[in-house]
Design a protein with these regions (language model features):
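Short acidic, S/G/P-rich loop/turn micro-motifs used as interaction or catalytic elements
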Residues: 17-21, 42, 61-70, 96-99, ...
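A short, hydrophobic beta-strand element within the central beta-sheet of small alpha/beta folds
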Residues: 59, 83-100
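Alpha4 helix (beta4-alpha4-beta5 surface) of REC/receiver domains from two-component response regulators
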Residues: 69-73, 92-116, 121, 125
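Conserved dinucleotide-binding and phosphotransfer motif residues
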Residues: 30-31, 81
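Short beta-strand element of Class I
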Residues: 35
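Acidic, metal-coordinating helix/loop segments flanking the phosphotransfer/catalytic sites
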Residues: 39-58, 62
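Conserved phosphotransfer microenvironments
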Residues: 54, 59-86
Length: 135
């Protein structure tokens, strides 16, 4: 794949939950994003291996059975493996969310966030902020 020249932000989305993948992909596309979807981490690493480059403006990761810290570490490895520049944001969405964190976003650093997903509006606000996209 080649880098797109239009202004539609591209999200590289790794989602291991089949039901969530379908609904979130649809919602993200309805919000106006170009979404490259991988059903699992192995495929995501395979896509980004070799000489080709898959352009993404943001990496969004939801791995089943992983703690937020584990998902962040894996997401950082994927972002580095993908040869994204030092300015590509990473957002992880933990599978299990403590009730008191539901609907919140935790800033780990300027480029890494944990989204304790409650609804698409929450994710939309975070993505808009990170991608400087006016929706």
């Amino acid at each position: 794949m080649h880098e797109t020249t239009n202004s539609i932000p591209t999200i590289f989305f790794v989602e291991e939950d089949n039901n969530a993948r379908r609904s979130l992909t649809k919602s993200l596309r309805e919000l106006g994003y170009r979404v490259l979807v991988s059903a699992d981490l192995e495929d995501a690493f395979e896509w980004t291996s070799g000489t080709g480059h898959i352009h993404a403006d943001l990496v969004l990761v939801n791995l089943l059975g992983k703690l937020p810290e584990e998902a962040l570490t894996i997401g950082c490895r994927l972002r580095e493996h993908s040869k994204y520049d030092g300015h590509t944001p990473l957002v992880v969405m933990p599978e299990k969310v403590p009730q008191d964190l539901l609907g919140t976003d935790e800033k780990v650093n300027d480029l890494e966030w944990i989204c304790y997903y409650e609804d698409i509006e929450q994710l939309k606000r975070l993505l808009t902020r990170l991608l400087n996209k006016n929706t």
